[in-house]
From Swiss-Prot:
The gene is pucC. It holds the Pfam family PUCC. Keywords: Antenna complex, Cell membrane, Membrane, Transmembrane, Transmembrane helix. Belongs to the PucC family. It is a multi-pass membrane protein. PucC is required for high-level transcription of the puc operon. This is Protein PucC. The chain crosses the membrane at residues 31-51, 66-86, 106-126, 136-156, 179-199, 207-227, 260-280, 298-318, 327-347, 350-370, 384-404, 429-449. It comes from Cereibacter sphaeroides (strain ATCC 17023 / DSM 158 / JCM 6121 / CCUG 31486 / LMG 2827 / NBRC 12203 / NCIMB 8253 / ATH 2.4.1.) (Rhodobacter sphaeroides). The keyword Membrane applies. InterPro entries: MFS_trans_sf (IPR036259), PucC (IPR026036), PucC-rel (IPR004896). SUPFAM superfamilies: MFS general substrate transporter. It is found in: Cell membrane. One of its GO terms (cellular component) is plasma membrane.
Length: 459
């Protein structure tokens, strides 16, 4: 381990956020090495949602509706996250592993998707050497690449978090999962800055180098994270007499009090925070005339706000604060952020736009940690992996709907002649206003849960 890492380990829980997630069973240095799988996932998310979103729309001139659909394709696997987690719970392996084989499969899918993606995007854009190539070829190859990346990301993250909870003591599992998401946000910040620097100025050959480099980095990061991490167990080599049924476990989980209501809250809140993902960077480039590097840093700004929100939520929740109330406050914090983003259109002020983006990210961090903690507390010990999968499935599915819907809605509004007189920012403002509406609806839906929780504490 490097001197810097050793110094961080010695700092201790008092100053290092989430250091109290470590234990004798899972030391901090081992926990940080395991979290490298989230670094790989963060790089992939930034590349898809941030960098390639801007490059496809502005540089490659791909319609925003096509971009929105492409970016949402990886999220087709989102509804299966609970099933993926359940399958890794019950996997039978000759080597005595349950998690490692699934993470390895996800890594290969992610690597393969990135291997063909840059060439597919260049053909999709139809410029330069790809001019005159059939449109269907670019669409089909790009769709395949995005699907492979999506399958890899969801598999790696779901099973990786399950492995982290396996290794951590029961009482430390929410802290460990919180640390994993903080690492994800930090990696997104640095990845967005790095990709912006590498792609400024943009040219096709550099795009190929960057995406291919990410493919190689993802493979090695996951191999380092998994090295001697999961202990081998002879019991995992024996096939049970009766195969466990996913449907039975799912019905048991969803029948718990407020489980379905809580998943609805997660979906609505994610719609509120998620639609901005696909239009923040095009909005900055088209309306506020920001460069590729400047708009790519928007992802870092958004993730930075989320990092602060996630850390604050973890600190407060660790002192007994109600996670549902935390989710309510997160949705409430997102409203002024979207108002600032919408106001930046009239003021043509980049700093107001950045401030609004930061506040929206902060609210998203509070909301995500609140709903994640509430979901984990809802599940018994033997269903924590299923609970994580359910949270991830609803969150990622809603994010996919939000991303696709925002791109299509932006294109429809942009094509309406009645809005042409309001300037190029009008379609974006309409989408941001819709997001604010979803957050307000989320707050309304959370209120009955808060009242029932308050009544239960009074008994």
């Amino acid at each position: 381990m490097s001197r810097i890492a050793e110094h961080l380990v010695r700092i201790g829980p008092r100053f290092l956020p989430f250091a109290d997630a470590a234990s004798d069973q899972l030391p901090l240095r081992k926990l940080l090495r395991l979290s490298l799988f989230q670094v790989a996932v963060g790089m992939a998310i930034v590349l898809l949602v941030g960098t390639l979103n801007r490059v496809m729309i502005v540089e490659l001139k791909v319609p925003a509706s096509v971009v929105g659909i492409m970016i949402s394709l990886p999220l087709l696997f989102a509804p299966f996250r609970a099933l993926i987690g359940f399958k890794s719970d019950t996997h039978v392996s000759a080597l005595g592993w349950r998690r490692v084989p699934w993470i390895y499969r996800g890594t290969l899918a992610l690597w393969g998707g990135f291997a063909i993606m840059p060439f597919a995007l260049i053909v999709l854009g139809g410029q330069g050497y790809a001019e005159g190539q059939p449109f269907w070829l670019g669409v089909s190859s790009a769709a395949l690449a995005f699907l492979m990346v999506g399958g890899g990301v969801h598999t790696i993250q779901t099973v990786g978090l399950a492995l982290a909870t396996d290794l951590a003591p029961r009482e430390d599992q929410p802290k460990v999962v919180g640390l994993m998401y903080v690492v994800l946000l930090i990696s997104m910040i640095f990845a967005s800055i790095g990709f912006g620097w590498l792609l400024d100025p943009y040219y096709d050959a550099q795009l190929i180098k960057v995406i291919s480099g990410v493919a190689v980095a993802v493979f090695f990061l996951n191999m380092i994270a998994l090295w001697k991490m999961e202990p081998r167990n002879r019991a995992f080599t024996v096939k049970p007499e009766k195969e466990p049924e996913f449907g039975d476990h799912w019905r048991e989980f969803i029948s718990r009090e407020n489980a379905l209501h809580g998943l609805i809250v997660i979906g609505l809140g994610t719609l509120g925070f998620g639609m901005a993902d696909v239009i923040l960077e095009p909005y900055g480039g088209e309306v506020l005339s920001m460069t590729v590097a400047e708009t790519t840093r928007l992802t870092a700004t958004f993730a930075g706000g989320g990092l602060v929100g996630f850390w604050l939520a973890s600190w407060v929740l660790g002192r007994g604060f109600d996670p549902l109330r935390m989710a309510f406050l997160g949705a409430a914090a997102g409203l002024p952020g979207f108002f600032a983003i919408m106001g930046a259109t009239e003021m043509t002020n980049v700093w107001v736009f950045l401030l609004g983006t930061l506040v929206v990210g902060f609210g998203g961090g509070l909301f995500s940690h609140g709903t994640l903690t509430a979901t984990m507390r809802l599940a018994p010990k033997e269903q924590v992996g299923l609970a994580l999968g359910a949270w991830g499935a609803v969150q990622a599915t809603a994010a996919g709907v939000a991303i696709a819907g925002a791109g299509v809605l932006r294109d429809i509004l942009q094509a309406m002649p009645d809005l042409s007189g309001y300037g190029p920012g009008a379609p974006y403002v309409a989408v941001f206003a819709l997001e604010a509406g979803f957050l307000f609806l989320t707050m309304i839906v959370i209120l009955p849960l808060l009242r029932s929780a308050l009544a239960a504490r009074r008994l």
